[in-house]
């Protein structure tokens, strides 16, 4: 084994159930064995687990429920305790304690809450406890949900300061086409940058019991790689897959980390789900992308959503393409009022000012 590393392992519902309606406990036992072996060798392991809704449905005897958010939250509330109990029981066989962390998007949007979550996660790791993370599905609304555990795992990897992120799924990795319908599809072993062409071939491999697909795994890989974290998509059914990843053995698809990782503050900006959106003109787009400039109010064409000063927002060009994320110096109402105006007019319009820029370049990261 190499020197101690931190690995985040994301386990999708399809991996935990084997595509069935119930948790595949024998397979979960094997995955825990692999993690425990790495833990004993001095590595730090973080589990991001799906399966709460599937566990709840199984525990209640597969009830016929309406396809509503309330029904899913009911199942998650029942299943979450069953799921963490299972992880606790299995890791305890190896004398390893686990600690549960339930997160929502709000924990990532607010800088203070982000730092608190980071400190809690790292404290667990520092005390040789395996964090078991899931989204708080029992209470999260659409407005505060991360939305899928692929993206949640990327955020967890950032919080943990991970070296590697392993996304285990029911596919061997990313293919040139959907291997279920195209026998000519080839496994892509190495990716050095995610572009539109790669997103176009990602397809959709959603399990009937889960909420993620290959496209969300690409999103997660993009976030993690830009934060300096190697990301691997591999089949959870492959024997010894977790140990192989830590040994550097080629499995699945490896997304190579960005050579110059983001600094800590920009990791938060990149990982935080945007609280709102602004559209900018061609001049502002060029200034941001080509010259690395701050965004001035003059370049803003429209503001979407309601957000506070200090929240992360999405910056889009006139075609609607996401070009950058950044921390807004003004709230949404103020930006609507000063949009299209010169910076020297801000004080006259608002009666106050927080500086001449809407989003400073030091608080911005291009996509």
From Swiss-Prot:
It comes from the Bacteria. It catalyses: L-glutamate + ATP = L-glutamyl 5-phosphate + ADP. Keywords: Amino-acid biosynthesis, ATP-binding, Cytoplasm, Kinase, Nucleotide-binding, Proline biosynthesis, Transferase. GO terms for molecular function: ATP binding; glutamate 5-kinase activity; identical protein binding; magnesium ion binding; proline binding; protein homodimerization activity; RNA binding. Catalyzes the transfer of a phosphate group to glutamate to form L-glutamate 5-phosphate. NCBIfam families: proB. This is Glutamate 5-kinase. It comes from Escherichia coli (strain K12).
